[in-house]
Amino acid sequence: MIGIIDYNAGNLRSIQKAVELYDKVIITNNSEELLACDKIILPGVGNFGSAMENLAPLKETIYKIVDDRVPFLGICLGMQILFEESEEKRGIKGLGIIKGNVIKFKDVEKLPHMGWNSVKIVKDCPLFEGIKNNSYFYFVHSYHVNPDEDCIVGKTEYGREFPSVINKDNVFATQFHPEKSGKIGLKIIENFVELL
């Protein structure tokens, strides 16, 4: 069973439909239900500050899931809130599961960065099993993560090169939306579901 964390951050149905192609899914904000799942997805569309406020009752549950080495996938805002803090809402702490912060794109013609863009794979990662390097995925965001180099799996160019995929132990995250990225995005979800 795959658990999708429901914290009023939108986009739940599209990720649910994508995951249901490969496994049973529960969308929930109930700690016991989440702790019983084999894998967890933290989706997200919206604002860093309100996301952290809505997630507050589930923080300890998320830490336990990660500590128990349950495969965990953050998507878009769900990637960003894994970090320590964001320029989007100064003074609000992120989950701090991944060291680093979230910064706004600078010196770009247009925000948000929206549409299809390629991901250059810089390190082996099971999420990209069977996926060609420089494949295209769908992005919608104005901020990007700024992590330690050792957890970066994929990079994307938009005004500058930024980390678009990370992996640290059992935690995986994508800045793009695999559920909106056609067959190649579904392959990412399938690879996540099949993780041991």
UniProtKB/Swiss-Prot annotation:
Single GO MF annotation: imidazoleglycerol-phosphate synthase activity
Localization annotation: Cytoplasm
Record-linked InterPro entries: Class_I_gatase-like (IPR029062), GATASE (IPR017926), Imidazole-glycPsynth_HisH (IPR010139)
Alphabetical list of SUPFAM superfamilies matching this protein: Class I glutamine amidotransferase-like
Sorted UniProt keywords: Amino-acid biosynthesis, Cytoplasm, Glutamine amidotransferase, Histidine biosynthesis, Hydrolase, Lyase
Active site (UniProt): C76, H177, E179
Catalytic reactions on record: 5-[(5-phospho-1-deoxy-D-ribulos-1-ylimino)methylamino]-1-(5-phospho-beta-D-ribosyl)imidazole-4-carboxamide + L-glutamine = D-erythro-1-(imidazol-4-yl)glycerol 3-phosphate + 5-amino-1-(5-phospho-beta-D-ribosyl)imidazole-4-carboxamide + L-glutamate + H(+); L-glutamine + H2O = L-glutamate + NH4(+)
Keyword Amino-acid biosynthesis belongs to the record: yes
Any one GO CC term of the record: cytoplasm
EC number assigned by the record: 4.3.2.10, 3.5.1.2
Known pathway: Amino-acid biosynthesis; L-histidine biosynthesis; L-histidine from 5-phospho-alpha-D-ribose 1-diphosphate: step 5/9
GO biological process: L-histidine biosynthetic process
Keyword Kinase assigned: no
All residue ranges annotated as the Glutamine amidotransferase type-1 domain in the record: 1-196
Known role: IGPS catalyzes the conversion of PRFAR and glutamine to IGP, AICAR and glutamate. The HisH subunit catalyzes the hydrolysis of glutamine to glutamate and ammonia as part of the synthesis of IGP and AICAR. The resulting ammonia molecule is channeled to the active site of HisF.
Annotated PANTHER family: IMIDAZOLE GLYCEROL PHOSPHATE SYNTHASE SUBUNIT HISH
Subunit structure: Heterodimer of HisH and HisF.
Protein name from the UniProt record: Imidazole glycerol phosphate synthase subunit HisH
Lineage: Archaea, Methanobacteriati, Methanobacteriota, Methanomada group, Methanococci
